[in-house]
């Protein structure tokens, strides 16, 4: 026995941007400890679950999380003590019941998620299993094709690039470790190219470079140059993935997309769709996330109709890992993929439900980090457990990003000959 929850502890720690975040310890009767820390985002969807912040401007500029910590200690812990850590669904449902709001604004998604993940870690430890084995089925053996962020723009940097993330995907790699090697080689090659062009090679929140490029196109051009210079073929060995985060560019009053960091150009929804269609013809782009704004459902529909059969179109701000929004998207035939961010929804149970719904509808799913991360590696285990085949967890720099890749390398080693890496085949929503 000994698998019942004895006590839950919580504390305020610091994330990769120097902001406070929540860490929880779930301690079982036999002394087993499960620990988890939650991330936070810079560009957030308006429908995301609420991250509870203290709001006291004199402490951490109002970003303290002591209220969330107190909620774990004073409200969640007494209610969960004595419950079986092996029943993740029951634990998560109990916390949702305790919160009682549609967006987790009472207890805070940062409090609920920390306990949800720590419970899974404690249960896995108690059973002598790895987290991916515990959360996954008997066939949790697919290593993800990574989306590696190598150039940052928009809200993630201070340059003249409108789009938030330019990423590479090693779709031609044979194994996950090969994929990481290829990505690292392109990352280092890009650094040399930027340096020779006189650009800064400091990195942004997610470890990608944030050079003051002259245009959005130049970002794609230097990435293409880096892929070729590293000895790879763009589109065959390594493809480009984008997260323009266009909700940040959209003006709901004029219903136009404003390229506020570069040309100040304003585009209608239809013009934005045509813009992406041209880019997909010009560059080896395999995936675009948030290509249209979260409130521009008509624009999303037009984009999906235009290029949804050619590339992966990922809803992040659009779906916020929430089954009700995903259901709407599926019914409207909008997008063909969902980004999975555990802290957008707040529990592991709801995360699994969202992935299940996506898979049933033929939508792909990508497990993702946030721009404010910690050393916690739960999402690395989660992506293998869920078998989504894709992960987005930053660049090949910064320990908060590398921690996830290193955990996946360990998992690949543990799986040995049964480890699978699907490369381009993960795009089942377009490989029909």
Swiss-Prot record:
Pathway: Carbohydrate degradation; glycolysis; pyruvate from D-glyceraldehyde 3-phosphate: step 4/5. Mg(2+) binds at residues 243, 289, 316. It catalyses: (2R)-2-phosphoglycerate = phosphoenolpyruvate + H2O. InterPro entries: Enolase, Enolase-like_C_sf, Enolase-like_N, Enolase_C, Enolase_CS, Enolase_N. It is found in: Cytoplasm; Secreted; Cell surface. It comes from the Bacteria. Its main location: cytoplasm. Keywords: Cytoplasm, Glycolysis, Lyase, Magnesium, Metal-binding, Secreted. Disulfide bonds: none annotated. (2R)-2-phosphoglycerate binds at residues 164, 341, 370-371, 392. Its cofactor is Mg(2+). The active site is at 206 (proton donor), 341 (proton acceptor). Its EC number is 4.2.1.11. Pfam families: Enolase_C (PF00113), Enolase_N (PF03952). Binds a second Mg(2+) ion via substrate during catalysis. GO terms for biological process: glycolytic process. Belongs to the enolase family. Catalyzes the reversible conversion of 2-phosphoglycerate (2-PG) into phosphoenolpyruvate (PEP). It is essential for the degradation of carbohydrates via glycolysis. This is Enolase. The lineage of its organism: Bacteria, Pseudomonadati, Spirochaetota, Spirochaetia, Spirochaetales.
């Amino acid at each position: 026995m000994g698998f019942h929850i004895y006590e839950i502890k919580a504390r305020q720690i610091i994330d990769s941007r120097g902001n406070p975040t929540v860490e929880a310890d779930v301690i079982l009767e036999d002394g087993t400890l499960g620990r988890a820390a939650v991330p936070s985002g810079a560009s957030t969807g308006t429908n995301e679950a609420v991250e509870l912040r203290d709001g006291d401007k004199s402490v951490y500029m109002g970003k303290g999380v002591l209220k969330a910590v107190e909620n774990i200690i004073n409200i969640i812990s007494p209610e969960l003590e004595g419950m079986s850590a092996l029943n993740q669904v029951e634990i998560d449902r109990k916390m949702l019941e305790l919160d009682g709001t549609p967006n987790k604004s009472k207890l805070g998604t940062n409090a609920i998620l920390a306990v949800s993940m720590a419970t899974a870690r404690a249960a896995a430890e108690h059973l002598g299993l790895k987290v991916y084995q515990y959360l996954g089925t008997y066939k949790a053996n697919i290593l993800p094709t990574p989306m590696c962020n190598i150039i940052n723009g928009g809200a993630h940097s201070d340059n003249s690039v409108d789009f938030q993330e330019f990423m590479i995907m090693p779709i031609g790699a044979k194994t996950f470790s090969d994929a990481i090697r290829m990505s690292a080689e392109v990352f280092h090659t890009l650094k040399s190219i930027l340096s020779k062009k006189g650009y800064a090679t400091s990195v942004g929140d997610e470890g990608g470079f944030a050079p003051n490029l002259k245009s959005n196109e130049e970002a794609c051009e230097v990435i293409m140059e880096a892929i070729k210079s590293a000895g790879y073929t763009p589109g065959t060995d390594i493809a480009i993935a984008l997260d323009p985060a266009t909700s940040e560019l959209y003006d709901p009053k004029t219903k136009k997309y404003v390229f506020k960091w570069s040309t100040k150009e304003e585009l209608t929804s239809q013009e934005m769709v045509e813009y992406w269609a041209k880019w997909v013809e010009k560059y080896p782009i395999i995936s675009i996330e948030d290509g249209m704004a979260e409130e521009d459902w008509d624009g999303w529909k037009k984009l999906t109709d235009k290029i949804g059969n050619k590339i992966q179109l990922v809803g992040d701000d659009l779906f916020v890992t929430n089954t009700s929004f995903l259901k709407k998207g599926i019914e409207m035939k909008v997008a063909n993929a969902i980004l999975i961010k555990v802290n957008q929804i707040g529990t592991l149970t709801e995360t699994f439900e969202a992935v299940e719904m996506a898979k049933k509808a033929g939508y792909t799913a990508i497990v993702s980090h946030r721009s404010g991360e910690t050393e916690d590696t739960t999402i690395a285990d989660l992506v293998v457990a869920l078998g989504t085949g894709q992960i987005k967890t930053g660049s090949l720099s910064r320990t908060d990003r590398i921690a996830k890749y290193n955990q996946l390398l360990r998992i690949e080693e543990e799986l040995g000959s049964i480890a699978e890496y699907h490369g381009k085949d993960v795009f089942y929503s377009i490989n029909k």
